[in-house]
């Protein structure tokens, strides 16, 4: 074998290496779609609600499930993810929840041609699970606006939190289910705030 061939042999062998750069661990993806337990029909003349895009605060744009550590930090799961950005999933779930609440004749998204008088602007502020506390947590903050002609005014500001129990040693599917339940708890709290806020607005007219 020539000296040139000997020099090229290690390069050829390296090119045949097929070992992966990282372990071949399948990614698990989870839904985030808490549903209202019952569905109510809105009364005649109920308002139309527009929900603007729900955004996540910094740290909640990751797809990976978020675990709160005992030291106050957070860890993002590398192989366990939401199906889509959690704020997008929360927005779709919130629209369905509020439509089922019976408070509004319709709950629409930006781009809808439906005439609306109420606008919801919200952020997803919390979505994690805390093994040390045996709970999952979710939170939303924002404002409910009344829009008429070219003016608008704030009917309600809110910062709601939801919690759900989490068993010790829970795996990723159980943690995702607990976070979904916590988000549903936050939605229920928001619905109660809407009932009070809309009643106050009607009384003030």
Q: Which ranges hold each PLM region?
A:
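Extracytoplasmic/secreted envelope proteins and their assembly/folding machinery
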Residues: 87, 91, 95, 101, ...
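A structural "domain/chain start" motif
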Residues: 16-86, 198-205
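N-terminal export leaders
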Residues: 3-7
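Surface-exposed helix-capping loop/turn segments at secondary-structure junctions
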Residues: 102-107, 192-205
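Surface-exposed short loop/turn segments
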Residues: 17-31, 35-40, 101-151
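Short secondary-structure boundary motifs at beta->alpha junctions and helix caps
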Residues: 75-81, 150-192
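Soluble periplasmic/extracytoplasmic beta-strand elements of cell-envelope proteins
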Residues: 48-53, 66, 119-124, 139-145, ...
């Amino acid at each position: 074998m020539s000296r040139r061939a000997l020099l090229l042999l290690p390069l050829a062998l390296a090119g045949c290496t097929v070992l992966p750069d990282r372990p071949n661990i399948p990614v698990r993806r989870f839904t985030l779609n808490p549903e209202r337990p019952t569905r109510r029909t809105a009364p005649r003349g109920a308002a139309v609600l527009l929900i603007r895009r729900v955004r996540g605060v910094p740290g909640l744009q990751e797809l990976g499930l978020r675990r709160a550590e005992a030291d106050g930090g957070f860890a993002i799961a590398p192989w366990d993810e939401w199906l889509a950005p959690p704020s997008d999933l929360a927005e779709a779930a919130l629209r369905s929840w509020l439509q089922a609440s019976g408070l509004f004749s319709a709950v629409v998204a930006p781009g809808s041609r439906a005439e609306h008088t109420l606008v919801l602007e919200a952020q997803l502020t919390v979505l994690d699970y805390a093994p040390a506390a045996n709970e999952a947590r979710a939170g939303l903050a924002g404002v409910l606006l009344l829009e008429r002609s070219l003016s608008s005014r704030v009917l309600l500001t809110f910062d709601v939190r939801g919690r759900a129990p989490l068993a010790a040693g829970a795996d990723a599917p159980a943690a995702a289910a607990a976070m979904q339940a916590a988000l549903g708890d936050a939605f229920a709290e928001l619905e109660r705030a809407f009932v009070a806020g809309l009643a106050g607005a009607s009384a003030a007219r």
